[in-house]
Design a protein with these regions (language model features):
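Conserved alpha-helical "signature site"
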Residues: 1-150, 155-156, 160-237
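Terminal helices and disordered tails flanking the catalytic cores of nucleotide-processing hydrolases
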Residues: 217, 237-269
Length: 269
């Protein structure tokens, strides 16, 4: 039941991700997916008419909006819409305001999207993984409202990480909750696995798990971290090696993520 309380947008994000893996994907197919969510459609058309993309003639159709923004940007923006739908009131049990949740998800997503390129991984898949990194926390926070309304994560208590607190309060961690939620949305196995296991990538073979650990670590270092996670970020050569990223070459990709982050944060979307 933990997944049923969410809107349909993540399903659209999952299906879009699959579509965009095909370089010959048709505009019509992408527009068809977006039309499943009227609120999303309205936001895209509004975006296409914003100052950044404005044309002489106002845009009235999803097809034109997608054409103007481009597939990659549309995929990113659907992700931002997912964040906005879910994180509206922040995560009360975790003490995370909605703005910080949005910044962390977006920055982690853009970092892993950029780092996926030198690692030879699919950037759209990586972006989705970064974006939905905290989806388990969202599910558990919703659960807390009915099952543990007084539960509050405090970073000081015992000095442990957030997953230990989750196990004590909910009987499961946000990684386990994420697997349940994302499996019910029919996300690809590697996406589910990467998010579910990114707190403990040691010994895992999936590069995306290591990439996500790395991206979340960098996001925290730059000032967009979430409470109680520092202890899960690995500062080892193995993480970079298994992620397929050369530490020396990573800086331009991190800078690029920063540029897109600033743009999307300012976006009227």
């Amino acid at each position: 039941g933990i997944a049923q309380s969410f809107p349909s947008t993540p399903q659209i994000l999952a299906d879009l991700g699959v579509l965009l893996k095909n370089p010959d994907v048709e505009l019509k197919a992408v527009a068809q997916q977006l039309k499943r969510d009227p609120a999303l459609t309205a936001r895209l058309i509004r975006l296409a008419n914003s100052a950044a993309l404005a044309q002489a003639e106002p845009v009235a159709s999803v097809e034109t909006a997608v054409n103007l923004a481009g597939f990659q940007e549309v995929h990113r923006l659907v992700g931002v819409a997912v964040l906005d739908q879910f994180g509206e009131g922040g995560l009360v049990a975790y003490g995370i305001p909605s703005r910080r949740l949005r910044e962390n998800a977006l920055f982690s997503a853009l970092l892993i999207e950029q780092l996926a390129k030198p690692a030879g991984e699919d950037p759209a898949t990586a972006y989705t993984i970064g974006l939905l990194r905290s989806i388990g926390k969202l599910g558990l926070d919703r659960l807390a409202r009915t099952h543990a309304p007084d539960a509050r994560f405090s970073h000081e208590v015992g000095g442990g990480g957030v997953a230990e607190w989750e196990r004590n309060v909910f009987g499961m961690t946000n990684g386990e909750a994420a697997k349940t939620i994302m499996n019910s949305w029919r996300f690809p196995g590697e996406t589910v696995k990467a998010i579910g296991e990114h707190y403990a990538p040691a010994g895992r073979h999936l590069p995306l798990t290591h990439l996500l650990n790395l991206a979340a670590n960098i996001a925290e270092k730059i000032g967009y971290g979430l409470p109680g996670e520092t202890c899960y970020w690995l500062e080892t050569e193995e993480v970079y090696r298994k992620a397929g990223v050369n530490l020396r070459d990573a800086k331009p990709f991190i800078d690029r993520a920063h540029v897109v982050f600033d743009r999307l944060l300012r976006s009227t979307f």
